[in-house]
Amino acid sequence: MSNGLFQSIKENVVFVVVCIVIALALFLIAYAAEKYVVRRDGIKERILNTRKVAMIGLFSALAVILHVMDFPVPFAPPFYKLDFSEIPALLGTFAFGPVAGVMIEFCKILLKLLVKGTSTAFVGDLANFVIGCSFILPASLIYLFKKTKSRAIVGCVSGTLIMTVFGTAFNAIYLLPAFSKLYGMPLDSIIAMGAEINGGVTGLVSFVCLCVAPMNLLKGT
């Protein structure tokens, strides 16, 4: 499996670099937000310590188990898979902060690649990571500023809506064109796959609205 993974990395090195840059950017956003709250509240505990790192490993393991148990959905082409790995990621984020959440999401994808490799030239893996972060980061930031049950609920609802809007737009603007280019598959062919499932799909916008958005809503609920 490792040889296949290294071969995939060599074949898609530019895209892999883009993935790493995006991951670093999300980590820095989470770190800056958490650092602000730590200073504001006078919290002396470090953002990352031995206990947190151990718990990040535990939640990452739970997340990757749920991630590899993904399954296709009837309203989208078969390369779209639904999983519930955001549950342990969200719990870890609420418990230990947004930096821990981003690290859980990253470790989940890294472990999955080591176990199963990639079947989408890393496009699906980037999508899962970035869209997952678009859910847990808003949710955790809303909760972080005032840790109450109502804020947690508001955070989850807001995170779901943001993930749905962002995930839909990210698919249309970047992920689907990247998938099309990496696999040499015309974008129209991908849209046609959606049209076979749902007659309402007539173009890229209707594809992401009818095939991608419902899946992101399900992930958040």
Per-range role (PLM):
Residues 1-221:
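Loop-helix junctions at membrane interfaces
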